Amino acid sequence: MELTDSNKKWLHPWLLAHRIDLHNHLKRVVTTATEQYPAVPLHTGSRIACVDAETATITLQDGTQVQGDVVVGADGVHSVTRHAIPGGQLKAACRGKSAFRFLVSKDAALSDPITARLVQHQGQLSIWYGSDRRIIMYPTSHNTVLNFVAIHPEAESATESDDTWGQEGNLDKMLQIFKGFDPAILSLLGKAGPQTVKVWRLLDMDVIPQWHHHRLALLGDAAHPFLPHQGQGGGVAIEDAISLSVVLGKDTPVAEVHERLKLYHDIRHERATRIQGFSRLIGEDRTGDNELDSK
């Protein structure tokens, strides 16, 4: 994809990152004390049973209760905290597509004359389309690793895929599903380690009317699950977090939390909802009659 002109328009470069690298960096930041902020303790394996938005109290499945000034529900597409928001009883569901995910060493692709031409350019995202399926490839980890998303009709891998992130996929099945693609692309797919291929259903959800209630606010996929066709899920979640940090300054009185969360919702809801809609449009099958609104 040639992004020179769009980068001039938006004034910001398009950055591609390996998700685990981003996770590790964020973890280091929050767990490392500085002169300005103490280290933040992380309590893993703490499954939520319910949330009281009015008192900002979380009850864990083991009965432990934790109370604070505000609860931020950033618990993903299968969010429990969403259910404490009026109108938030929606569930994400598959809309007909699944995706294989896997990594390939760029050196391995470059060393093969059949696949080298597909990966020779630095920092290039490539998409290969079929009418109802597509393969997305982009570099991560300083151009040393190629990250793949192979989107296809859900029915063709239904016996393997589910709604979790760790479901193992079958390399041979993937190659069969994309058998109509160029042989060089299939050779590139074949370089995936058979044990590293994952597959899951792509989930979407109707728009919820509000992201906040009393002293609870939603963030990221808990508020707006995105289909992956623009690669915006992580970026918009970070935007949510930055916006929340602005409206909830360090010395915000508890009595003002509700109004501040309403402001957060007003700032973020329309933008995220629009990106959700554009992601759906871009993900539509290429039938020749689905055009994005030029406006």
Language-model features, listed with the residues they occupy:
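Glycine-centered loop/turn positions within well-structured domains
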Residues: 49, 56, 66, 79, ...
